[in-house]
Amino acid sequence: PGRKAELRTFLWFGWIRIANRIHQGSNDWNACIAHEMTHWQQYRRSWGLHPLRYKFSAEYRLRSELEAYAAEYASYRDCDPGRLHQFARWISEDYDLDVTLDQSLDLLSAELAS
């Protein structure tokens, strides 16, 4: 029962984030779900500590978002460079991280190449 409750809570917040992403202009549910499922995998890998590490560690938050946006980008059928730039902009502006757009774009490109 504990894991099911964790999953329900995570999915509830995940759907809120998916709705917000669609509101921001994303029109591909599968890509948004790939992003949020990556966060679920991070949660599982961290033995449930993902939310705390995400909140209190900018370095962890950056790595988490790079991995999630790379998964989202890879799930699109086209590899539109404009979309990659948009994701890099969101990473640099929306996550309280001390990274520039250029740094974010370089890091995201490296994540995709790995």
Give the location of each predicted region.
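Helix N-terminus capping/helix-initiation residues
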Residues: 1, 57, 98-100
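Hydrophobic or amphipathic, alpha-helical segments that drive membrane association/targeting
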Residues: 1-13
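Post-HEXXH active-site segment of zinc metalloproteases
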Residues: 10-11, 16-19, 27, 31, ...
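Short, surface-exposed binding/anchoring microloops in extracellular/periplasmic proteins
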Residues: 23
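Histidine-centered divalent metal-coordination motifs
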Residues: 35, 39
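Long, well-structured alpha-helical subdomains associated
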Residues: 76-114
